[in-house]
Amino acid sequence: MSDDRPDVPYLNVEDILDSPDRTGAVISPDGSKFAYLAPWRDRLNVWIQDLDGEEKARCVTADSRRSVLRYHWTDDPRWLLYEQDGDGDENYHLHRVDLGNPDVDAVDLTPFPGARVTGFDLPPTRPGHAVLNLNHRDPAVFDLYELHIATGELTLLARNPGGSSALVYAPDGTMYGHGLSEDGDIELSRWETESGTMRSVTTFPGSDHPLGLQPFQLTPDGTGAWVGSYRDSEHTRIVHVDLNTGQETVVDSHPGLDIDPRAAVFPTLPSPLILDRRTKDLIGVRYLGERAVIRPLTAHFADVLDNLRELSDGDVAALSSDREGQRWIVSFTHDRDPGVTHFYDHTTGDSRVLFRPYPHLDPAALAPMAPVTIRARDGLELPSYLTLPLQRKPAGLPMVLQVHGGPWHRDSWGFDPTAQLLANRGYAVLQVNYRGSTGYGKSFLKAGIGELSGAMHDDLVDAVGWAVKQGYADPARVAVFGGSYGGYAALVGVSFTPGLFAAAVDFCGPPNLVTTLRNMPDFAKPYLTNNWHLYAGDPEDPAQEADLWARSPLSRVADIRTPLLVVQGANDARVLKSESDQIVEALRNRGIDVEYLVKEDEGHSFVNPENNIAMYHAADHFLARHLRGGGTAAAGSSI
């Protein structure tokens, strides 16, 4: 297929998949500066710039091996903290940067091989300190520590007795945790210091929460917690749990939407709870439907939010303010003008654009993402998104079914680099929130139980049928593309319905559910009860092991005849490289067309820009070859 759209500029893979010029801005507590992420030696690092002065921005971290994605201002203007893992192994360490002495190297404050920091917090009642969970004693168990930021001294606060996913620290020194009871429910408990045991406060149905209690946040006085709960509701709502009595009180809810669930999977995304910078009071809650909805809980934040919404026709995304709640930095989600970041002064009403992450991308050259609803064969409505190429008749197009991971996640409106690249090549892109996706209510979530390779796959098949029936897609030129669970879905697509797809791209997808679940990292194993074991099965049960194998693409490898591109990070802690090796070897032994791209310095998702660029060059070339699209193969380029 030749590209006959002279007014649509051809976008290089690098235009969309390279690191942004700037992103991830957060204002300093005193409101005088802001930090952001920008490239240094081809890696995202933390930079700091004055908001009012003319002082030149300076880079304050120096990681030339792997991009920094998570950082934190502290209450001391001297220190900045950031988190970093080792080439994608998900063992995140906490590092300290001395902002007053740029010549001093960053210090690893948790220098324990194989250890992982989680549950990081900066309690306002303990200035100069951080509280964190660390599993260096036992990879499967996270103990609670207090960190003195200036000296690096770690003090054990509570030794986790097991069964608690993480411990949190209240202002009065009381500690709480949430873990699984014997029957799989989630138990919120208080740490009893004298006995070193946990005492139950209340429980939540485990099957309602495959990823645990999300969100979970102690109130500033430590006597309660704000929790996302389905109890007595079809949609998640914020409840206040009294940590003495266990009594629940509804704080906020939306009549038709769930709380935004995305930060539970991607912690770099904004939390659904918006807190006051100084008091830590709850001032707003994020919900998510076709578009994002923020409900303000205070008059001051409602006024601020009204003014912020005037800055863009996108959705309010990341937010930060100074301690007084007067100076704000806000970024916006937008399908064609992504991440535009503004400074807003509530005292004066002044605002200005700080930066666009991708200033070289013209919004007019990018394709809009449209919400659509698809009815599955059993009548279930599947909220979905359709991106169509610009200046091309939306009929008989090659199409890519782009499947989100998780499966306890969801697609949402906004800038999607994969969808934009594919639309630029002339493909229609369909993203389906199949049953089991989060954010669409309890019934929709639980409709995925036991349905891997079953009704969850049928939803994707029905979505392809919908696109063909609507006239958008050429049934002979449909590909499937996904990562993690989406990669599994791609493999299921070519093994369980081998005639449906003309090509498939699997990024870190598990071809063998039995071995994948047995090889889960130690830190994940205690919490499989309400996600993988409930939705798919427990490989330690012989009957369930047999069912898991029957739902595994590797069990039907003899049926695969579709061209396949497999992409894998060598350090993936969740889907080991040996998993992808299995299916690649089996297919090559049968003479099936399979391309295999492995990156030695990546894990379950790719972070470094050259690796993302290499993957998408490979996918661009591969899809152009098999769908006769407008990618690099059609353009005569090579990879």
Regions found by a protein language model. Give the residues of each.
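A fold-wide structural signal in alpha/beta-hydrolase
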Residues: 399, 423-433, 595
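Short hydrophobic segments within beta-strands
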Residues: 228, 387, 402-403, 481, ...
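Acidic helix/loop microenvironments that form the catalytic cleft of cell-wall polysaccharide enzymes
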Residues: 405-407, 485-486
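Hydrophobic/aromatic beta-strand patches that form the interior of the parallel beta-sheet core
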Residues: 131, 283, 372, 401, ...
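A structural micro-motif
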Residues: 55, 104, 196, 427, ...
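Peripheral, non-catalytic segments that deliver or gate enzyme domains
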Residues: 2-8, 12-24, 29-33, 37-70, ...
